[in-house]
């Protein structure tokens, strides 16, 4: 783990910040490329920008709320983003609200639908999530619980407080699974005639992998019953994605048979 990438007189460049910025830049670039393929490059880029801003705000807010026992006594740390700490679920919900509002806002007759914009943004989102996991690996956030007896899945890693132990390699595993999901979405995006397929497939992939990763995490969070809040949210994401995809598929078949 290399928390600091570069340090000079009066200046410190954190690895977490660099990787996070790389993810954001990749997300915007891929949104523009997909928007151009779908004949709406400007709209896709605008949607990505607003979604990104709302997503960052939601991600930090979700992390602070999930760790309120700490931040209630260290409130200034809530604004210190470079130290690490973003909630994927808070970021997703914030971005989803922004995208929904943007798609519904009346602008022009050729305005793209929510589903088309969501398709354009999803590959970049998933690649950004991979960068986010790598950033957490460097900063120690979203760390795995202590474990043993799991070859290749248990590494000697620190938590966010710098305490090293044999832990589930949650962050590297999250990055790897996210990259696999990105490759699938990117290589198959031209094969599907259903608008919204990439977005909903992304929900299923991110929800199912998120649920599995939550089982390995050791960081503090909210619990709803005996499950981490992230487990519930991941399950809802995967089920909602599957249900909506089935609905879109049935509607697509009905429209083409009429």
Q: Where are the language model's segments positioned?
A:
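A feature for loop-to-transmembrane-helix boundaries and adjacent hydrophobic helices
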Residues: 1-258
């Amino acid at each position: 783990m290399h928390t600091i990438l570069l340090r000079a007189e009066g200046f410190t460049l954190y690895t977490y910040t660099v990787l996070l910025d790389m993810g954001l830049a990749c997300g915007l670039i891929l949104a523009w490329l997909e928007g151009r393929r779908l004949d709406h490059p400007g709209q896709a880029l605008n949607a990505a920008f607003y979604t990104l801003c709302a997503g960052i705000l939601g991600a930090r807010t979700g992390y602070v709320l999930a760790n309120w026992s700490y931040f209630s006594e260290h409130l200034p740390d809530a604004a210190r983003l470079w130290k690490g700490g973003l909630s994927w679920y808070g970021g997703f919900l914030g971005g989803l609200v922004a995208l929904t509002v943007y798609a519904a806002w009346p602008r022009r007759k050729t305005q793209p639908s929510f589903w088309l914009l969501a398709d354009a943004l999803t590959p970049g989102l998933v690649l950004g999530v991979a960068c986010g996991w790598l950033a957490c690996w460097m900063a120690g956030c979203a760390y795995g619980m202590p474990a043993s007896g799991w070859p290749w899945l248990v590494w000697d890693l620190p938590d966010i407080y710098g305490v090293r132990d044999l832990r589930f390699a949650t962050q590297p595993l999250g990055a790897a699974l996210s990259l696999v999901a990105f490759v699938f979405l990117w290589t198959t995006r031209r094969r599907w005639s259903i608008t919204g397929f990439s977005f909903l497939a992304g929900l299923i992939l991110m929800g199912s992998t998120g649920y599995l990763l939550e089982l390995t995490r050791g960081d503090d969070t909210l619990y709803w019953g005996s499950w981490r809040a992230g487990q519930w949210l991941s399950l809802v994401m995967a089920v909602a994605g599957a249900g909506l995809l089935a609905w879109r598929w049935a509607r697509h078949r009905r429209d083409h048979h009429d």
